[in-house]
Amino acid sequence: MKRPFIISLILLLLFFSVSAQRVGLVLSGGGAKGAAHLGVIKALEENGIPIDYVAGTSMGAIIGSFYAMGYSPDEMLELILSDEFGYWQTGVVENDYKYYFKRPDDTPDFMRFSIELSDSLRIKTNVLPRSLINPIQMNQAFMGLYAQATAKAIWNFDNLFIPFRCISADVYNKKTIVWRNGDLGDAVRSSMTFPFFFKPIWKDGVPLFDGGIYNNFPVDVVKEDFHPDFIFGSAVAGSEVKPSENPMHQIQRMVMQHTDYNVAEEDGMIVKFNFPDVTLLEFFKAKELMDIGYERTLSMIDSIKQRVAREVPLSELNARRRAYKESLPSLKFRNIYVTGVTESQRIYIEDQLHRDINGEFSMEEFKYAYFKMLSDAKIKEIVPKAVYNRKNKNFDLYLDVKITDEINVNIGGNISSHQANQLYLGLGYQGLGEYLTDLNANFQMGNAYSGVSFSGRIYMRTPIPSYLNLELAYSYQKYSESQSLFYEDLLPAFIKQREKFMKLKLGLPFMTHAKAEIGLGYGRLSDNYFQTTNISFLDSKFDKSWYDLFRMSLRIERNSLNVKQYPTEGRQQFFVAQYVTGKENTRLYNQPIQSKIDLNWLQIKGRWINYSKVNNHFRLGVMGETVISSKNLMNNYTASILQAPAFTPTPHSKIVFNEAFRANQYIAGGVIPVFLINNMFHVRGEFYGFMPVEEIKKEIISLSPYMDRPYYGNHFRSFEYMGEAAIVFQLPFVSVSLFANGYSYPKKNFNVGLNIGFLIFNSRFLD
């Protein structure tokens, strides 16, 4: 009897020993290399190896936290490869969330700084940002990712699906911070905040950075906090790295201190990876790295099972995972608490968040409102927090808003090898109370174009968002006898155009990503010109035509092009209908009599540009433009051509006067093949055709050799074309382009040039 009893007792003790055996998983940091951790987890799960605790640093903290919230390895891979993950790590806002209604007009600026309106009038430059990656995406994304798990855990990381720890670095006090509780999103984000790249999270008045600075492989934390029976470590960092000229590698070596990437044999096992060709942000390689991690771990399964006798079937794990996810509270918001603002600013911000019939709004609805508010220059940053309200069974939304009171100064223009050297200065101020107001002034000066514009805009609190915009503008543009390479301004202009106008516009959102403007305007347009080039410009006087015009207009537009000059992706569409009435006044230099003609016409213009992705290195752009008008001809041929709409699809065509590409009605289009070398460098071709509906022609009057009578030719009898090839360096702040182009008229019209900057002029009266 005694022997069977002893055997039974031993078996019982072994059973409890095995069933009580606990396993801890430790994941190192390493940026995109950390995707190998996914394969490690997948191999362990499929072979029944339990994971009872998880801890990680940096990328290991991201993957560890996802696992602790019930994500499977395949779900984590899908998230890492998603477009959203790419937006988070770059700070780029996807087009669906760009609030086009408040998008400012493109300007040729490439440097910005601001002047704080305080007693000291401090000047802050934006040349060196606080972080290379804009935190605008992470601020909202991490709240959406982690709020539900934080709520269910009651801010205690032991209450997650898998108990979790992560590491941050307090560089001011030179110590490691272990996150055991608090906001899970803040914990993970601080653990992955690589200096200079990401903006730090503040805790107890101290900024926290990437935990890998002091402890990139937290085996000690797992042992101290969880006391597991077995530790399995996955290390994607720590291998010997040869000295490199890559600045990113050099910064990593400077910042990261020594970490021991080992697990003592008596404590467990480790799998180490060496990925010398994978950089910090190459997450597109995640599937390849996951497969490597999976195969390496599979090769160790037998050895692991000799140390870990306990098994957890994958079906049982997945059932627990589903039950955990179903128990998470729904991410719905009701109460809003705003800090960092005045009472009137709080009212404005809360008005941007529209609740449903139950007084709630979803994360998706908040996301739209979040990016909408950040389109206001006055709002510098919004840091959202979601706190679960157990009484109401929804979340309270806390918004820490940073408001600026400053004048924004923009400087830019264009440096060119031809007649397109421009200097630009822009000043802007935005006021925010119960209403949002915009005040802007910009000045351009150059040897081809000069102009000044003042505008004021107020966004009204109406059921449908709307604004009123008042603009006052003056511009002067001249066209000279020569536009040759390295042109010096010695030759006089043979055409000078001036515009003075005022516009009042009512703006409204149109559909989702467009806006409509209903406008009234009054302007005086003046043209000084010679009606022939067969004269001595220096000794002759200009003919002059001026137009006092009133216009009513409707404009609908959308624009998702990725850059303001030489785009490679996106779409632009606009439609403008306008009715114009007024008088034409003409005075010829050799005739004292001034002629006056009444003018009335309706004009419709439309443009469509779209860039399609053919493959990773080739884009194909397609462009179409048309103008339909009831406009009559002016007093003479030159006046008619000058006031006819012009087709100017390239930067160079905007600063040259080419009568062959002007008509009151026309159809134009083109193709734009773009060959991408990398993110900053591409080669492009632009090929366009232009066909007037009725070409404006001239009849020479024998009695007046310097005056030509205009008339319309036959329909669709003329066709012109232009082409341009360009090598473009698209830097983050400026565009550099070397181009060569040609026009079908006049013959042998070829040009080569270099531009550094942007050729973008102020809007014109009849735009």
Role assignments for model-derived ranges:
Residues 364, 375, 381-561, 565, ...:
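Gram-negative/organellar outer-membrane beta-barrel architecture
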Residues 218-219, 251-264, 670, 710-714, ...:
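Short glycine-rich, acidic/polar surface loops and turns
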